[in-house]
């Protein structure tokens, strides 16, 4: 059963049918350009609930990627960030056909770099004006992947997915938060409920395939960070044990002129830990 906070978030959105399956979408009309919020692995758009409350009269939209949160979780299925980018394009076309600015976290940063690559190639079907990447292992060789991530992407991934339970998930998820802002019981329950909806924990090994795509498409996605001709900033929580400051250093090497805002000592989920500071940083970088 979904906790009340999740059901409230769900009640404010709707399901949108795409070529790949139905995805949960939540949006708010307002002044533009609309803010497009992309979440990470293994969570959902629920991560941004406190951020959206701090966007004032700004239009925004977000979604749960296919396989995540309140969206369909097909199996068997070959999950791909290229498909997720297609889904994002379909959602934008349906919800906010005007110009957008982009804020992406974790796995969502690689979906974002695919969108940047398409924009460079002239194949992106919407106008993307600015983008901000936050705590995502875009340069995977510089990241400190968790042991569970390494197992999930390997031959024993299906076994680990079958064995995943709430206790183990919460223990690992808590390690992503800083000591100053530890994972709360309510947050843990909500995150597990969203992931485990429709037995989503059983497909974690399928969802984790995005890590291999970060290797396969490194030249394309790193090149997009380097070459995209519009403003791109980095908003980084420096206490992240996975997407560490080593990743940020690599991004700075790719794009030395990028504006960077650091959130000292904060963990992997700054939008949950410090929504005020996170939203303020995002608004500054996106100039909204």
Residue ranges and their predicted role:
Residues 1-35, 56-59, 92-99, 123, ...:
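Alpha/beta-hydrolase fold catalytic core
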Residues 16-19, 61, 65-103, 117, ...:
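Active-site loop/oxyanion-hole signature of alpha/beta-hydrolase fold enzymes
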Residues 27-70:
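Conserved HGGG/HGGXW glycine-rich cap/lid loop of the alpha/beta-hydrolase fold
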Residues 104, 108, 112:
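Gly/Ala-rich beta-loop-alpha elbow adjacent to hydrolase catalytic centers
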Residues 117, 124-160:
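Flexible "cap/lid" loop of the alpha/beta hydrolase fold
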Residues 142, 163-226:
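Conserved alpha/beta-hydrolase catalytic His-Asp/Glu region
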Residues 200-253, 262:
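Conserved serine/cysteine hydrolase catalytic core
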Residues 266-279:
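Catalytic histidine-centered segment of alpha/beta-hydrolase-like enzymes
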